Amino acid sequence: HQQDFVRRVGQDCIRYDIPFLLELLVYPLPNEAPDVVERHKSKFVLDSVREFAKPEYAVDLFKLESPVTDSELGDPDAKQASPVQQVFMEMGNLAGCPWVMLSAGTTAANFRRILKI
């Protein structure tokens, strides 16, 4: 259902020669515990980008939430930032087009840390 809708919007954007900006947000399904997204956030965000980056959706620009939780951030200048950086690099590679980062309700300090990574 959502994929068909996004596909139709992408085709309309092509038809009317307007850019398609798609904002992806992950939420738990109705039968899932609320913490399921937090535990698997990287996988869910990356899977969403992987799907909607396919040419059939015709997305020109993504608005994406961080693929990592605040608790995974650590110090962006420390060695442990490297695995987090890898997740961001994978997200960028999967997107295949420009993307901007959403704050996703995090604090200003944590958003700055995300941007530093």
Language-model region placement:
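Active-site beta->alpha loop and helix N-cap motifs at the rims of alpha/beta catalytic domains
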Residues: H1-L21, L29-P30
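Active-site glycine- and acidic-residue-rich loops that bind
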Residues: Q2-D4, A33-L46, E72, L102-R112
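Generic structural signal for hydrophobic
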Residues: V6-V9, C13, F52, M91, ...
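Structural recognition of alpha->loop->beta junctions
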Residues: V37-L64, I117
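Catalytic-face loop-and-helix region of soluble metabolic enzyme cores
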Residues: L61, E65-I117
